[in-house]
Every structure is written in C-alpha cells, then in structure tokens.
From Swiss-Prot:
It comes from Buchnera aphidicola subsp. Schizaphis graminum (strain Sg). Signal peptide: none annotated. The lineage of its organism: Bacteria, Pseudomonadati, Pseudomonadota, Gammaproteobacteria, Enterobacterales. This is Small ribosomal subunit protein bS6. Transmembrane segments: none annotated. The gene is rpsF. Keywords: Ribonucleoprotein, Ribosomal protein, RNA-binding, rRNA-binding.
Length: 113
C-alpha cells in the first residue's frame, strides 16, 4: 500500500452536504482496505482565482494509505461528481498525522481570542 495526500474542493452550493460527501469517500477508502491517517475539513475559503465564476469553495484534506486501484476509483468519482470542482492527489513517502498549517493557524487564532 502507498501513502497519498488528497485535497479536493467542493462547490459552495453543496456546503450543507459536505459531511455526506466526506462519508462517501471514507466508505470508498475503507471498502478497498485503505486507512485514513488524517482528515481535515478546512471549511469554506476564498479561492486564489475564480473557477467557473466561483470565488469560494469548501476544502477537504485527506492523508490515506491505500492501493493504487482505490486512487483510480477516487479520481473517477472526483471527475464525475459535480460537487467537486478541483482535486489534487499526491503520492507521499510516509503517513502524515500531525495537523496541517491551516489547522494550526486556526487553533492559534482561537487561542488568542
């Protein structure tokens, strides 16, 4: 099994259904003997540039360990799912469990308040 980092952006019109979409991808990963090492919901964020006339999107980060065939299934689903407007899948050398810089920044802001 290999390690992957996946970030995908969900159309802002589907923000209420984010948990359902996440569960769908978690089922695909677990059904194919995959392990989720990190799952982060970054929330709705401003895009660097408009995509299909959209200025915001809901970001999700996954660090998983799975077989390449599972990645093919995820890529196909991302491609045909209208809720997912962009995605990137990167192969990494080892599992990443610590919080991402985005989450660390959010926690620091909460601590300051």
């Amino acid at each position: 099994m290999r390690h992957y980092e996946i970030i995908f952006m969900i159309h802002p019109d589907y923000s209420e259904k984010v948990s359902v979409i996440i569960e769908k991808y978690k089922k695909i990963i677990h059904h194919n003997s995959g392990i989720i090492h990190r799952l982060e919901d970054w929330g709705r964020r401003q895009l660097a540039y408009p995509i299909n006339k959209l200025h915001k999107a809901h970001y999700i980060l996954l660090n998983i360990e799975t077989f390449p065939k599972t990645i093919s299934l995820l890529e196909t689903d991302f491609r045909f799912n209208n809720a997912v407007i962009r995605n990137i899948i990167i192969s990494v050398k080892k599992a990443i469990n610590e919080p991402s810089p985005v989450i660390k920044l959010k926690e620091e802001k909460k601590d300051k308040k």
